[in-house]
Amino acid sequence: MSIQDVNTIANRLSLREPQRDSLKILDRVLEISNLTKGADTKQILEIIQSEFPSVKDFERAFPSLCFSLATGVGKTRLMGAFIAYLHRFYGVKNFFVVAPNLTIYNKLHQDFTPNTPKYVFKGISEFAQNPPEIVTGDNYESGLGAQGNLFSKVVINIFNIAKITAKDGGKLAKDDAQRSVARVRRLIETIGESYFDFLASKEDLVVIMDESHRYRASAGWEALNDLKPVLGLELTATPQVERNGKSVPFKNVIYDYPLACAIRDGYVKEPAVATRENFNPKQYSADELEKIKLHDAVCIHESRKASLQIYADNKGVKTVKPFILVVATDTKHSAELKGYMESPEFFEGRYAGKILEINSATSGAEKDENINKLLTVEDPNNPVEIVIHVNMLKEGWDITNLYTIVPLRAANSKTLVEQSIGRGLRLPYGKRTGEPEVDTLTIVSHDKFQEIVDYANDPNSLIRKTVIVGKDVPESGTSVVKVENPIDAIINAATQEITPSAGGEESPIVSGVPQEKS
């Protein structure tokens, strides 16, 4: 193939540079390697290492390469580019996309479905006329995948990793040998074999692993090997696994685009850490410090909320409804925080009914309702402005309106920073606007402030900005007040936002809200 072939796909899908670079690497790998079923993996590894020495080992029974891209850069779009490229230039028709959990599984299913907001193949002409057949963990037993092959269609299988390992033998007799066999490996009469074996027999099966760090040490690892794909493509923002308390990096990373690069290149929000001027955390008890951090988080939130409203009004774009993420220690702590922030003691009780608690203590209808509120937190009609969670937010929760994070869990500064900010880095308008209030994610961490600032001096740090409450942000909440212009009202019954300014121009008024009494 040629660079023109890569550019054809990249341009049609409007790929960002990191995505385009990844596609170029795949193009080169396929150019120098003979990737066929049953090929000598050791020989292929040596060939790839000759140009990409970072690949030390495939770590699987088949050639598998990891593309590490920071959160928010666009891993799902890159999956679409890989599939479009492999089909157009190499005739590949069988793909198996693996998700680590139900949330990502549902998201992938939606994004690979035509006429959806984030459809991954927008601009690919052949898929517009003849879209791929989407086979999922919910419909594979219908024989849809085999039918797609019969009509020479591209077949994209999307499975939650649990689906290829789950036995689900509840409906079988206790003495039925099939009870010990994963359901996907059981005979389907319409195709004459199990769907798993059907896939494993394909000469061109390519496996794409989303968030691949999540199933490197499970039964799913062996199951993927048993599929015997011709190629594995792994995507993750964290190319390492935790073993015995230590971080073990992947050995098959062929491309690494870390978060620091994404921040530098403007693909995500810029993180900032907040504190108060001349603040000494040692003067306060743990409870007092916690309340100060929550108070200041709301001050930042309300300032940000006003700024986002002003930006939307001035630019004629959608209004973004920001929210705060509070990371609690445990379920008891979470409940205490919610009770305090809904009480009259906290900003006169105006956040009552606007706080969502996400933890393992909820179940049934309440859990379903909370999950729905969490997944729709970007909706302007969703009242939630504060989310409290206890280690329950996993990959797949892709939101763009998180602007303030309050980490209350004990953590060292580096871990605190990197684990927290990943949740809120996606940009609401798809790119930076040039307005700091719109483009910045703020972490409220008075007690860890100096540690994080010291970390920020590291050239590889993710953080370069600081916010001082009482200086950069008012110590009381703010809101946008729309004042009717009487002249406009008389002439055309319109309203506009005005406020006196030193230059004589009119702009929105930002008014103070009484500060919480300590």
Give the positions of each predicted feature.
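Signature of the SF2 helicase/ATPase Hel1-core->accessory helical subdomain module
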Residues: A81-A84, R88, L102, H109-Q110, ...
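Conserved SF1/SF2 helicase motif Ia
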Residues: S68-V73, G80-N106
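Inter-Walker segment of RecA-like/P-loop motor cores
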Residues: Y119-I188
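Conserved RecA-like P-loop NTPase helicase motor core
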Residues: A361-N460, R464
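Conserved pre-motif I regulatory segment
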Residues: S2-S68
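Conserved interdomain linker/interface between the two RecA-like ATPase lobes of SF2 helicase motors
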Residues: K251-A361
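Long, hydrophobic alpha-helical segments
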Residues: R426-S518
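Conserved Walker A/P-loop ATP-binding site and its immediately adjacent core
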Residues: G91-S125, N160-K163, T329-K332
